[in-house]
Curated annotation (Swiss-Prot):
Signal peptide: 1-19
Reported impact of L1279R: Strongly reduced response to semaphorin
Glycosites: N60, N549, N1163
Main location: membrane
Modified residues (Phosphoserine): S1597
Protein's name according to its UniProt entry: Plexin-A3
Positions on the Cytoplasmic side per record topology: 1242-1872
Organism listed in the record: Mus musculus (Mouse)
Organism phylogeny: Eukaryota, Metazoa, Chordata, Craniata, Vertebrata
PROSITE patterns in alphabetical order: SEMA
């Protein structure tokens, strides 16, 4: 056997449980999978079976030995194995999966059975795992070659004399001729004996084995028996099994499979298996059946459980786990249940069954084994419990299910394994779950199972079936695929109080009283003493103290502590108060303790700063153990902290109020006057409640207050005063105490300034002796008021608060008190007077002034003296009665009334008329304004289109639209949110569309008038989306430009961009350019702190307000960054700078180029004297050329909405030359000759430079030529090597087919995952009835044809509508595919006829989806070719997809452009030389940190997202894409040692910027090395802000060189174009190749490029590598019989139909027939599937894979074409690529069509039978009612046209189809 390196690890793991953090030991493997566990019952050593390994571990999980068992050269088809006979099948290294691990105690050896060589076993010495033997020479040595590790169970039965026996049950994987499913075998002491594993008994008729009959396998090919658990009890051997339920499973192999659990029993001494009996077994809970057995464990019941069950305590019981239902054996439901069986009950069922059979009753009832029903034979025989069978009446099956007792149900974790044992009187059950948890359950009765603890062991990794105890039952061993864990059975120490300990439910735990801890009884030193160890909650110590409170001024108070449930305390106890003070307690004869309270000094320490009370813990400390074992709360109170009498005597403590000293004290003797002491609230001085104290302004009056217990001031004490505080001023008024119950403030008047308030509340109190306040009730209020303030009219005066006693002084025209109004008495009016009403009402305003004549307008009338109640006011408006609305009436000021309908045809305008009481002249008025009746109309809505999510600001134009008081705008069923209106327009915000994109009518409701206009329609369109921003940064101030790409942007009326930072939201404007682009100004953010970080700030949210489209409100949080605002220095100290005209001006500043913005620059404008200047920008300065003008010019810089005034430029020109200077200049002309000489010398030098440049270019050309040669050589080498490599990788790939429903929906309704046809329809009964009638109507061919032809005739019936109707029709007819096929044929015939009549070329038929029939044809094939896809064509298509994906990912892929080194598409080919290295990273599995690391190959140039995708692809290989995590939800963590963990990201502070380009981070950028350890961890909330700043700082010393070189160029690659090129203004994002669509690449950039066409050799290399997979797919599709699959009937049937149509129309051109068939099937169905494999499989298709599949699909289309392909040097590369293959493919297509034509025709009857069966299989996959509801939409939309068409059609008239449809329409309408 080969030697394989293994890296097992021993860890201490922290277990996460309910309150527990105790570490437990683990043994972890990284490069194998663990399968089985065995624990030695004496030594406690642990043996672990695994794939290719067996381990021996010490009890503490330290590895002692490892034994290698594989891989082995083998082939599953070799029988006998290759070790015995040369095998014709190819041998490859095969993993040896351990399936059985048993300790043979008698022979001191380990039996380890595996999967290789047809299931041979090894015998290993227990001491060192030395291989004692490996029998593999006889057929008895081959147990089963099945690969499942948990499908085998075995039991060793030791014999008193002779060898032990091995009872073994196993799944046989369909090979029943080789392996028995159950057998009894000899375990010989000599491992090399030929008799080893031989059957215990065998003759020519009978043997110790059970085999699955071949007849059973021929009927049920999937039949097998999976053995879950085996055990011995008394003299019987038992097995729990799972097997196919042949009673419920249909013979059809593709149908649903049902399984049943059975218990098998045999006598241990039965050699002939005559005693074989099996019974169905299961459990039920709340009416739900649980029939999938998962695990079981045999144990003894605890005494309590035994008593509850009524069985002896030594009886065996079986704890069993079942999953719900009978389906999904391999992946059972997580709904599981723990059940209990007693062996006596099971044996009783079996005994009764045997007895009934021996009485001749019934049959043997074992159809899978006997293949027929054999009757029981009546045999007079006494059957007892130990009966072991005869040759007759066997084997025997049970007739009913043995039901267990349900104990515990779980619906989330998925219980998977179980173990149990007895502790004291309790049964304790341990359960492992599929989510990696351990559950602990106490079972004390059949109805008493308590889950008391859950421990997280291996998060997310299932606990396997083997769950075993250590010999002393102190630990339990759990097994998962990568880890063995040793956990203590109890963690009592986690509970810190007696209540928590004894309330936990853990039977192991009790409370050790004097040790004050939770532990086992044996761990408690004083447990044997009375009350030393508590096991019941009621036995916890209870402590009371008398007194339970003491004043802070009292010390040394003797406290008596009474206790219950305490042990002997004679050794001594001390008392302590929060460790501040401790004193020894005196033990009283009564058993109580006596403790002193703390001293005054100690009390100050305890209570300082704690106010009136402070609760501390009085603790009792045992002198025996030195432990504080009990405590009780104790209160110290401080009376002096209470400042009022009521709070003092009302406290729960003995506080006393000293009335004359105004203090609270705990000592009554401290009161200086005996009569001044108060000890109850009744004795407190207090102002009594008497309602509000009302004080009119300016009135001199005394204030008398009722009180009680008012103290009489003593000698030397001051008298009473009233203290009033108003508007910040304090007034003290002398007061007189009449007696103890009355006090009066002396005459005084009170004022407050201003008339803004009619009254104001005063701060009013009564004090004595200067500052002793008398207590007031909480409700006491004093109000100071002015009658005239805010009451200028009679009406306002009379509605004043009656308590103020204000009235209207008629002569003074003023609101006054009665005393202030001159006589006579009638001159003063008060509301209490009978008939009081104000004269001279006046209307100042009415609103609105117009309304509809239908009435309903609420008219608001404002004025004065408008009555005191609404009942006394009468109203008419424009001569029409207006009814007052009492709830909106404001006394004297405002009346709101509702207009009745005007019955006059054209009512004239008129005033509002009002009477108060009667209509006499003094009490009547009318308005100056006139009210008019109008007729509002509207004729236009603008805009007429908007997104379906609503939010569009609509303007509805018309006339008189401001009429009335209320307006409601309804768009179909939704209310448009009102904004404003005027006479010509109403503005409102559109609601969300309930129908999605659609046309909707508009209705206005103005009061009681309803206005509509059928000519005005509002159209809901698709919601706009935002797909890309450029750039993704701004400055703090915002206002920089952002270019936004998206879809449907023109439908947005007022788009805005928004940012939210620290709870503050800001927005800015956007301008839509076209439907896919808009330009926005970035919003600024408010930092809240002075200095932003240089690396930028990320807003909490960043997105767009696109009307009400929610999806755009918040984009990816981390993608937008705000950098610090630029700042500038002034022009010199004085602000003035002197320069010459045209010279450079340097403007210095900071943050001029944002830190991570690359070459995307801020747009600076520098104005000098108002004129812009040319700029050069660097990080710290702007270089500007000064203008030509002179003088003082102001300098201003504009950037991103910021303006900087830097100072003034003083531009001074040189003065004109003087005459001597001019003479000197002329004299210099003599030097001209010298200048000419200089020019000649320069020319010579230039010539030499040109020669040197020529040589340099020649050298570059030579270098380029060598690189081209190397590239071509590499491409050729890759072509030769990649094919085999790719083929090997594809072997064994699992195909993640989508289920039929999902597949069909994706093809029928592309892009709509949750289509209504998948959901139940919630409708009123009438509508449901109508839809069912509509469904019946669809089954009338005349109606359906008329319906479809009518829809197609409508100009507004779009292409999309045609596809939708076709798909909905097929769904609605899913249950009648035979009828749908006939309809489809008729529609196709009509289409052919129409095509020929319109003189179109016949070849154009079925080319596009311009009719319902064409889409129906696609859907028809979709339904009927699903099985062919799954069984035949799906495999090559999936392998092609995988091959393309893997081949693309072998080389670099640009994350921005999507270009790749390997590609079939020229458009997606990298045309540069990219240097890269392959790295192998070791990835920690996301679900389980402790599991084995997975090696993953990546490229050092991969972007981080690409690396994450490759890691996920490898870690979750074989897992459907929808069931695995997504890269965007995970962070990539690079781990260096224990502490250093770095989060890698595509962009962070180290992102490199070079000139105008910002480069995406790659693995090479982070300097990740080969062999590095990485982990995928769930993405954190702030993955960059938190993780990066922390991790990079911590690891700076290691990576400081990386950070310093953050701008150096590095090699980066990508896997797929998954990064959006988020670009800033002027900055381009790049990964591997700079996008040269930009025109601003640097000079010389092209100099580094090779001739791009050279790289087209890569296309050929990639094409050659993938050729096999393309050929396989085409061959499968274009073969009539391939891979054992016959041609689908649908293809032959449809091709024959097309030939019939051609014959009927005398079309003899073979090219036309060929084209019809190509358009019908390959182009309509296969091309769609090839381009969109995600329709068939649960996968993700990236852009490079899509591009390559498009090339394959184009080749497929070209292969089906009859036209000649004329290719030249200018033809597209994808045409040239397959140019030589297409003729061959064309021949395949022609042969395929010929072969189909030669096949026997399918009769309509046979086809109908096939279609009926297909309908039955998928009858319930879709909700037909929902489909009918969707179809009915088109009836509503084109109702009149359809009804008209039904009238015109004779057949429809004959069957009265119009009336039937109208009946349906009526039914629907009646429910709306």
């Amino acid at each position: 056997m080969p030697t394989v390196c293994l890296l097992p690890l021993l860890f201490f793991t922290i277990g996460g449980c309910l309150g527990s953090s105790r570490p437990f030991r683990t043994f972890v493997v990284t490069d194998t999978t663990l399968t089985h566990l065995a624990v030695h019952r004496v030594t406690g050593e642990v043996f672990v079976g695994a794939v290719n390994r067996v381990f021996k571990l010490a009890p503490n999980l330290t590895e002692l030995r490892a034994h290698v068992t594989g891989p082995i050269e083998d082939n599953a088809r070799c029988y006998p194995p290759p070790s015995m006979r040369v095998c014709s099948h190819r041998l490859v290294p095969v993993d040896n999966v351990n399936k059985l691990l048993l300790i043979d105690y008698a022979a001191r050896r380990l039996v380890a059975c595996g999967s290789i060589w047809q299931g041979i076993c090894q015998f290993l010495r227990l001491d060192d795992l030395f291989k004692l033997g490996e029998p593999h020479h006889r057929k008895e040595h081959y147990l089963s070659g099945a690969q499942e590790p948990d499908s085998m169970a075995g039991v060793i039965v030791e014999q008193v004399q002779g060898p032990s026996k091995l009872f073994v049950g196993t799944a046989v994987d369909g090979k029943s001729e080789y392996f028995p499913t159950l057998s009894s075998r000899k375990l010989i002491d000599d491992e090399d004996s030929g008799d080893m594993f031989s059957l215990v008994y065998q003759d020519e008729f009978v043997s110790s084995q059970i085999k699955i009959p071949s007849d059973t396998l021929s009927l049920y090919p999937a039949f097998d028996i999976y053995y879950i658990y085996g055990f011995v009890s008394a003299s019987f051997v038992y097995f729990l099994t799972l097997q196919l339920d042949t009673q419920q499973t249909l013979l059809d192999t593709a149908g649903e499979k049902f399984f049943t659990s059975k218990i098998v029993r045999m006598c241990a001494g039965d050699s002939e298996f005559y005693s074989y009996v099996e019974f169905p077994i299961g459990c039920s809970w709340r009416g739900v059946e649980y029939r999938l057995v998962q695990s079981a464990h045999l144990a003894k019941p605890g005494l309590l459980l035994a008593q509850a069950l009524g069985v002896p305590a030594d009886e065996d019981v079986l704890f069993t786990i079942f999953s719900q239902g009978q389906k999904n054996r391999a992946n059972p439901p997580r709904q599981t249940i723990l059940c209990l069986f007693t062996l006596s009950s099971i044996n009783a069922h079996i005994r009764r069954r045997i007895q009934s059979c021996y009485r001749g009753e019934g049959t043997l009832a074992l159809p899978w084994l006997l293949n027929k029903e054999l009757p029981c034979i009546n045999t007079p025989l006494q059957i007892n419990g130990n009966f072991c069978g005869l040759v007759l009446n066997q084997p025997l099956g049970g007739l009913h299910v043995i039901e267990g007792l349900p104990l515990l149900a779980d619906s989330t974790d998925g219980m998977a394994s179980v173990a149990a044992y007895t502790y004291h009187q309790h049964s304790v059950v341990f359960i492992g779950t599929r989510s990696g948890n351990l559950k602990k359950v106490r079972v004390d009765g059949s109805q008493d199972a308590q889950l008391y603890e859950t421990v997280s062991v291996v998060q997310g990794s299932p606990i396997l079936r083997d769950l075993l105890f250590s010999p002393d039952h102190r630990h339990i061993y759990l097994l998962s695929e990568k880890q063995v864990s040793q956990l203590p059975v109890e963690t009592c120490e986690q509970y810190l109080s007696c209540a928590a300990c004894l309330g936990s439910g853990d039977p192991h735990c009790g409370w050790c009283v004097l040790q004050h801890r939770c532990c086992r009884e044996g761990a408690c030193p004083g447990a044997s003493a009375p009350h030393g160890f508590a096991e019941e909650l009621s036995k916890c110590i209870q402590v009371r103290v008398r007194p339970n409170n003491v004043s802070v001024t009292s010390s040394g108070v003797q406290l008596t502590v009474a206790m219950r449930n305490v042990p002997d305390l004679s050794v001594g106890v001390s008392c302590s108060f929060e460790e501040v003070t401790e004193s020894e307690a005196i033990l009283l004869p009564s058993g109580e303790l006596r403790c002193p309270s703390p001293s005054l000094q100690e009390l100050q320490t305890l209570t300082r700063g704690h106010g009136a009370t402070h609760t501390v813990r009085l603790q009792l400390l045992s002198m025996e153990t030195g432990v504080r074992f009990a405590g009780v709360d104790f209160v110290f109170y401080n009376c002096s902290a209470l400042q009022s009498c009521m709070s003092c005597v009302g406290s729960p403590y003995p506080c006393h109020w000293c009335k004359y000293r105004h203090v609270c004290t705990s000592h009554p003797h401290e009161c200086s006057f005996q009569e001044g002491r108060v000890h109850s609230p009744e004795g407190c001085p207090e102002i009594l409640p008497q309602g509000d104290l009302l004080i009119p302004v300016g009135v001199m009056q005394p204030l008398t207050l009722r009180a009680k217990n008012l103290p009489q001031p003593q000698s030397g004490q001051k008298n009473y005063e009233c203290v009033v505080r108003v508007q910040g001023r304090q007034h003290r008024v002398p007061a007189v105490r009449f007696n103890s119950s009355s006090v009066q403030c002396q005459n005084a008047s009170y004022f407050y300034e201003g008339d803004e308030f009619g009254d104001t509340e005063l701060d009013f109190s009564v004090v004595w002796d200067g500052d002793f306040p008398i207590d007031k009730p909480p409700s006491f209020r004093a109000l100071l008021y002015k009658c005239w303030a805010q009451r200028p009219s009679c009406g306002l005066c009379l509605k004043a608060d009656p308590r103020f006693n204000c009235g209207w002084c008629i002569s003074e025209h003023r609101c006054q008190l009665r005393a202030h109004c001159p006589a006579p008495k009638s001159n003063w009016m008060h509301p209490s007077q009978k008939g009081a009403r104000c004269s001279h009402p006046r209307i100042t305003q009415i609103h609105p002034l117009t309304g509809p004549k239908e009435g309903g307008t609420r008219v608001t009338i404002v004025g004065e003296n408008l009555g005191l109640t609404s009942r006394e006011v009468g109203l008419r408006v424009a001569g029409v009665r207006c009814n007052s609305i009492p709830t909106e009436y404001v006394s004297a000021e405002r009346i709101v009334c509702e207009m009745e309908e005007s019955l006059v045809p054209s009512p004239p305008p008129g005033p509002a008329e009002l009477c108060v009481g009667d209509c006499s002249a003094d009490f009547r008025t009318q308005s100056q304004q006139l009210y008019s009746f109008v007729t509002p109309t509207f004729d236009r809505v603008s805009p007429s289109r908007g997104p379906a999510s609503g939010g569009t600001r609509l303007t509805i134009s018309g006339i008189s639209l401001d009429a009335g008081s209320r307006v409601t705008v309804i768009i179909r069923d939704g209310e448009c949110q009102f904004v404003r209106r005027d006479a010509e327009a109403i503005v409102c915000i559109s609601p969300v569309s309930t129908l999605g994109p659609s046309q909707s009518p508009i209705t206005l409701a103005i009061d009681h008038a309803n206005i509509s206009n059928t000519g005005v329609i509002y159209t809901y369109t698709q919601d706009p989306t935002v797909t890309h921003l450029e750039p993704t940064w701004s400055i703090i101030n915002g206002s920089t430009s952002i270019t936004v790409s998206g879809t449907h942007l023109l439908t947005v009326q007022e788009p805005r961009v928004r940012a939210k930072y620290r709870g503050i939201e800001t927005t800015n404007t956007c301008q839509v350019i076209n439907d896919t682009a808009m330009l926005c100004k970035a919003p600024g953010i408010f930092l809240g702190h002075p200095q932003p970080r240089a690396q930028g700030e990320h807003p909490d949210e960043f997105g767009f307000l696109l009307d009400h489209v929610q999806a755009a409100r918040s984009l990816n949080r981390s993608s937008f960054t705000y950098y610090p605002d630029p700042s500038f220095e002034p022009l010199g100290p004085s602000g003035v700078l002197d320069v010459k005209p045209g010279s450079h001006v340097v403007l210095k500043g900071k943050n001029l180029i944002p830190a991570a913005a690359g070459s995307s620059r801020l747009n600076y404008t520098v104005l000098i004297g108002g004129q812009p200047c040319a700029l050069t920008v660097s990080d710290t300065q702007l270089l500007c050329d000064s203008p030509s003008q002179t003088g003082r010019q102001p300098v201003m810089v504009l950037v991103g909405g910021l303006e900087f005034w830097l100072g003034t430029l003083h531009i001074t020109a040189d003065r004109a030359l003087t005459l001597p200077a001019m003479v000197g200049l002329a004299a210099g002309g003599g030097l001209l000759l010298l200048a000419i000489t200089v020019v000649l010398v320069a020319y010579k030098r230039k010539t030499q430079d040109a020669d040197r440049t020529l040589k340099r270019l020649q050298l570059q050309m030579d270098n380029l030529e060598s690189r081209v040669a190397l590239e071509c050589k590499e491409a050729f080498a890759e072509l030769q090597t990649d094919i085999n490599e790719l083929t090997n990788h594809m072997d064994g790939v699992q195909i993640p087919f989508l289920d039929y429903r999902t597949y069909a929906v994706r093809v029928l309704f592309p892009g709509i995952e949750a289509h209504p046809v998948l959901k139940e329809l919630d409708t009123p009964p009438n509508v449901e009835k109508a839809l069912r009638l509509f469904g019946q109507l669809l089954h009338s061919r005349a109606f359906l044809l008329t319906f479809i032809h009518t829809l197609e005739a409508q100009s507004s019936f779009s292409m999309r509508d045609r596809g939708t109707v076709a798909s909905l029709t097929m769904v609605a007819l899913q249950s009648r595919l035979d009828y749908a096929t006939g309809l489809l044929k008729q529609l196709l015939a009509d289409l052919i006829e129409k095509n020929l009549e319109s003189k179109n070329h016949p070849k154009l038929l079925l080319r596009r989806t311009e009719s319902v029939a064409e889409k129906m044809l696609t859907n028809w094939f979709t339904f009927l070719l699903h099985k062919f896809l799954k069984e035949c064509a799906g495999e090559p298509l999936f392998l092609l997809y995988c091959a393309i994906k893997q081949q693309m990912e072998k080389g670099p892929i640009d994350a921005i452009t999507g270009e790749a080194r390997y590609s079939l598409s020229e458009d997606k080919l990298i045309r540069q030389q990219i240097d890269y290295k392959t790295l192998t990273l070791h990835c920690v599995c996301p679900e389980s940190e402790g599991s084995a690391q997975v090696p993953v190959k990546v490229l050092n140039c991969d972007s981080i997202t690409q690396a994450k995708d490759k890691l996920l692809d490898t870690v979750y290989k074989g897992i459907p894409y929808s069931q695995r995590p997504k890269a965007e939800d995970m962070d990539l963590e690079w781990r260096q040692g224990r502490m250093a963990r770095i989060i890698l990201q595509d962009e962070d502070i180290t992102t490199k910027i070079e000139c105008d380009w910002k480069r995406v981070n790659s693995l090479a950028h982070y300097q990740v090395t080969d062999g590095s350890l990485v982990a995928l961890v769930p993405k954190q909330v702030s993955a960059y802000n938190m993780a990066n700043s922390f991790t990079f700082t911590r690891s700076l010393s290691r990576y400081e060189s990386l950070l310093r070189a953050a701008s150096s160029p590095d090699s980066l690659r990508s896997r797929a174009p998954m990064l959006t090129p988020d670009q800033e203004a002027g900055t381009k994002l790049w990964h591997l190749v700079r996008n040269h669509d930009h025109t601003d690449h640097r000079e010389g950039d092209r100099g580094s490029k090779m001739v791009s066409e050279i790289y087209l050799t890569r296309l050929l290399a990639t094409k050659g590598t993938l050729q096999k997979f393309v050929d396989d797919l085409f061959e499968t599709v274009f073969s009539t019989a391939h891979r054992g699959s016959a041609l689908p009937l649908a293809i032959k049937y449809m091709f024959d139909f097309l030939d019939e149509q051609a014959d009927q129309r005398q079309i003899s051109d073979p090219d036309v027939r060929h084209t019809w068939k190509s358009n019908c099937l390959p182009l309509r169905f296969w091309v769609n599937v090839i381009k969109n494999p995600q329709f068939v499989f649960d996968i993700h298709k990236n852009s490079i894979t899509d591009a390559c599949l498009s090339v394959v699909a184009q080749t497929f289309m070209d292969s089906c074409s009859t036209s000649e392909h004329r290719l030249g040097k200018d033809s597209p590369s994808n045409k040239l690529l397959y140019a030589k293959d297409i003729p061959n493919y064309k021949s395949w297509v022609e042969r395929y069509y010929r072969d189909i034509a030669k096949m026997a025709s399918i009769s309509d009857q046979d086809m109908d039978a096939y279609l009926v069966e297909q309908s039955r299989l998928h009858a319930n996959d879709f909700n037909v009612l929902s489909a009918l509801s969707e179809l009915y939409f088109y009836v509503t939309k084109y109702r009149q046209e359809i009804l008209t068409s039904l009238d015109r059609d004779a057949s429809c008239r004959k069957h009265k189809l119009r009336q039937k449809l109208e009946q349906i329409i009526t039914l629907v309408s009646s429910s709306s």
